[in-house]
Amino acid sequence: GPDGNSVFLEAPEGLILVDTGRHPAHRDKLLAYAEARGKPIVAIVNTHWHLDHTTGNADILAAYPGADVYASLAIDGALAGFLRESREKAEAFLASGKASAEQAAEIRRGHAALDDAEALRPTVPVTASGERTIAGRALQLNLAPYAATEGDVWIYDEAAGLLIAGDLVVGLVPFMDTACPEGWRGALDAIAATPFTTLVPGHGEVMDRQEFLAWRGAYNAFLNCAASTGTKEACVAGWQRDAAAFIPEGDEERVADMAGYYFDTRLRSGQEERRRYCAQAG
């Protein structure tokens, strides 16, 4: 799949890198930027553990071994559960001989990331929301529990009016593979209550406040439709209509398929599956 958005923040002590992508070409751009700036990467912030945002960690840390990694502890549960299961499925796909050369390369790169799991784990765990000074730059690191993942980190830079949302905001369709949809709704409420002027989503184009509010409205309407007696077709069509401004031309059919998949597997599945990635009682 595509790489998530990466963001560099300049700090007095060096560069802060938010998310490291998946593919070698993406990694090379990140390393080239740091070299061109003449500053070391002194900190990585991972918004969440999905491999399209974290696979580059190992290579960045190899180039800058002193860098700290700020992330939630959700990676531990992911390594024991979702990522282990995904690896087993991927290995079976490789063994079937049906994978294209590009797919095989991507799978092997993901496996290499899992084999170097320490690079995915935080050296500075984000266990609660709060102000932090990273490399001399004041930032607010916010923890959204049980949202797009078990622990999503979103960053607010008050001085710049900048909010980096990770996959809590994904232009074309919310990626619900490991999501608790209602927890995610709450995270979007917290973002809306933050006085940012510019928002960087996990995938897609940079948004202003009004664009974010429109996307959040589309997200809420999709959940509300799924909770109603509306049909799958009506709910998917509603997403496509409400989020049309964020869906790249030519991606409409793919988005419909993805929205339909998440409708079936996350929003309109049985209660146990629907709450699989939500906080468990007791």
Regions found by a protein language model. Name each.
Residues E106-I107, A192-T198, V206-G282:
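Accessory terminal helices/loops
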Residues A80, R84-L143, E150, E158-A159, ...:
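Metallo-beta-lactamase
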Residues A25-A71, A192-T197:
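Active-site metal-binding motif and surrounding structural segment of the metallo-beta-lactamase
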Residues D177-G202:
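An active-site-proximal "capping" alpha-helix that borders the catalytic cofactor pocket
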Residues V18-G21, V42-H50, Y70-L73, L143-A144, ...:
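Active-site neighborhood of phospho(di)ester-bond hydrolases with catalytic His/Asp-centered motifs
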Residues D3, P24-A25, W49-T54, D76-A80, ...:
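Active-site environment of divalent metal-dependent phosphoester hydrolases
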